[in-house]
């Protein structure tokens, strides 16, 4: 009985953590867009990058690529070309890995 309760608590914790992570990524993306509208480019870039990493870890490829492209554009805007292209290469690799994992084109 004690083992069953422990397993149920662990499952509930994992479910709550996943929901929190999903909401967190969406919130980061929203904050990044708001910062971009306010022309706070460095803050927006940082938030888009955090959202990209969060979506990538959740395997939400569409949102991850969108955030990655936005962060890359902000890197490029401030003449950080190496970082911009590195982020785009990582996004392309993420898509390739996702295609292999899902066995379909994204």
Q: Where in the sequence are the language-model features?
A:
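Amphipathic alpha-helical segments of tetratricopeptide repeats
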Residues: 49-54, 89-97
């Amino acid at each position: 009985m004690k083992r069953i309760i422990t397993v149920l608590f662990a499952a509930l914790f994992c479910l709550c953590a996943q929901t929190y992570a999903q909401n967190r990524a969406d919130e980061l993306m929203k904050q990044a867009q708001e910062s971009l509208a306010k022309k706070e480019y460095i803050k927006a870039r940082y938030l888009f990058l955090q959202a990209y990493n969060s979506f990538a870890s959740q395997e939400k490829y569409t949102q991850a690529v969108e955030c990655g492209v936005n962060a890359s554009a902000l890197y490029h805007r401030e003449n950080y070309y190496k970082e911009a292209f590195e982020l785009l290469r990582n996004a392309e690799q993420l898509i390739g890995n996702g295609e292999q994992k899902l066995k379909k084109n994204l």
